[in-house]
Amino acid sequence: MGWLRPGPRPLCPPARASWAFSHRFPSPLAPRRSPTPFFMASLLCCGPKLAACGIVLSAWGVIMLIMLGIFFNVHSAVLIEDVPFTEKDFENGPQNIYNLYEQVSYNCFIAAGLYLLLGGFSFCQVRLNKRKEYMVR
C-alpha cells in the first residue's frame, strides 16, 4: 500500500479503496463524467440502416399524404371512390359529400404529421448512431 512508506503518514488512505466505496463517494478531485452519453446511448433502438430507411419512408409518406390532403380539400372528382359516403349522403345535395371530402383531407394531414414525427425519430436515431461510432468503450 502506498501509505506505508517511510515518512509522515497521510491523513487518509489513497483513493484506491474499493470500487463500491469510490462509486458511492467519488473523490472531489476526480474529473466528473457527464451522464449524458450513457443516457443518449440508451435511447438508441434502431440501427443505422433501419433509421435511414425510416427517414426515406417518412419523407415519401409526408409528401404523398400532404398532396392527397390538398387534392381532397379541393374536392377532386378523381378521388370520389375514396370518400366513405352512403346513399343517405346524396339526399341533401353536394354539401354532405364536400364535408366528407374535407374530413378525409383532415385525416390525410393528421397522418402526414404522424409520418413527420416518425421521420424526426428516425433522424434522431441516425444522429445517435453517428455519435455511438465516436464513443470510446
Swiss-Prot record:
Transmembrane portions of the chain: 52-72, 104-124
EC category: hydrolase
Pfam families linked to this entry: V-ATPase_su_f
GO BP terms in the entry: endosomal lumen acidification; Golgi lumen acidification; intracellular pH reduction; lysosomal lumen acidification; proton transmembrane transport; receptor-mediated endocytosis; receptor-mediated endocytosis of virus by host cell; vacuolar acidification
Keyword ATP-binding: no
GO molecular function, one term: RNA endonuclease activity
Topological category with respect to the lipid bilayer: Multi-pass membrane protein
EC number in record: 3.1.-.-
Tissue: Widely expressed.
InterPro entries (alphabetical): Ribonucl_Kappa, RNase_K
Presence of keyword Membrane: yes
PANTHER family documented for this protein: RIBONUCLEASE KAPPA
Protein family per UniProt: Belongs to the RNase K family.
Record text on subunit structure and interactions: Interacts with the proton translocation complex V0 of the V-ATPase. Interacts with ATP6AP1.
Function: Endoribonuclease which preferentially cleaves ApU and ApG phosphodiester bonds. Hydrolyzes UpU bonds at a lower rate. Regulates the activity of vacuolar (H+)-ATPase (V-ATPase) which is responsible for acidifying and maintaining the pH of intracellular compartments. Required at an early stage of receptor-mediated endocytosis. (Microbial infection) Required at an early stage of both clathrin-mediated and clathrin-independent endocytic uptake of a diverse set of viruses, including dengue, West Nile, Sindbis, Rift Valley Fever, influenza, and human rhinoviruses.
Protein name (database record): Ribonuclease kappa
Native organism: Homo sapiens
